[in-house]
């Protein structure tokens, strides 16, 4: 049975209750304040997880990117090779486009076109 309008005005129906097991917004703010108050370094805080725990060290050391160890001549040779390959791809693509156009627009069909009266 439905309640009257007067009974429904005071209580919103779709608001979640705080005691349903949903954590409130205050504990993460307090945790951040406690980290700064305890004197921990800000860098340690950013390196750790979201909960403020320190990050686990990686099992193997991070290597530098190989591009940093190349001399400029090797980089220029690589760029020249990429440019040559792009030109070759462009030529082959144009060849296929031309072949496709010729096949579609040729007057001699591989099979006769029959029109039924």
From Swiss-Prot:
Keywords: Coiled coil, Nucleus, Transcription, Transcription regulation. It comes from the Eukaryota. The keyword Phosphoprotein does not apply. InterPro entries: TF_A-like/BEX. One of its GO terms (cellular component) is nucleus. Residues 41-81 have a biased composition (Basic and acidic residues). This is Transcription elongation factor A protein-like 8. May be involved in transcriptional regulation. The lineage of its organism: Eukaryota, Metazoa, Chordata, Craniata, Vertebrata.
